[in-house]
Amino acid sequence: MNNAIMDMVDKANQKENAPQFDIGDTVDVHSKILEGNKERIQVFTGVVIGRSGKGAQEMFTVRRIVAGEGVERKFPVHSPRIEKVEVKRSGVTRRAKLYFLRDRVGKAVRLKERRRV
């Protein structure tokens, strides 16, 4: 009984058109930012290094290098603040979590590109 109610609430909080992307993909995350009484869209570009959770609580982590420093941001997949997620490039990976990219610098961070036919 309790699980059925939780599943119903979980489905109600999920987006109908959730973004489709995989770990290793280079993505543009368009998120709504509220500054004072104005709302604008901020784009964060980087490599998806992991996904965690399930259902409405699912999160994904995006990593990029800014001015020589690694920056990681976690985004909820089903958040109303996420406008859209664009896949710029698909990467080939054999791991679910790409935390080893944290230790790499420069061209070593690049992943092989998956060819889409």
Swiss-Prot record:
InterPro entries: Ribosomal_bL19, Ribosomal_bL19_CS, Ribosomal_bL19_sf, Translation_prot_SH3-like_sf
Keyword annotations: Ribonucleoprotein, Ribosomal protein
Keyword Ribosomal protein: yes
GO MF annotations in UniProt: structural constituent of ribosome
Name of a matching Pfam family: Ribosomal_L19
GO cellular component: cytosolic large ribosomal subunit
GO biological process: translation
Gene3D superfamilies registered for this protein in UniProt: 2.30.30.790
Role played: This protein is located at the 30S-50S ribosomal subunit interface and may play a role in the structure and function of the aminoacyl-tRNA binding site.
PANTHER family associated with the record: LARGE RIBOSOMAL SUBUNIT PROTEIN BL19M, RIBOSOMAL PROTEIN L19
Similarity annotation: Belongs to the bacterial ribosomal protein bL19 family.
Protein's recorded name: Large ribosomal subunit protein bL19
Originating organism: Rhodopirellula baltica (strain DSM 10527 / NCIMB 13988 / SH1)
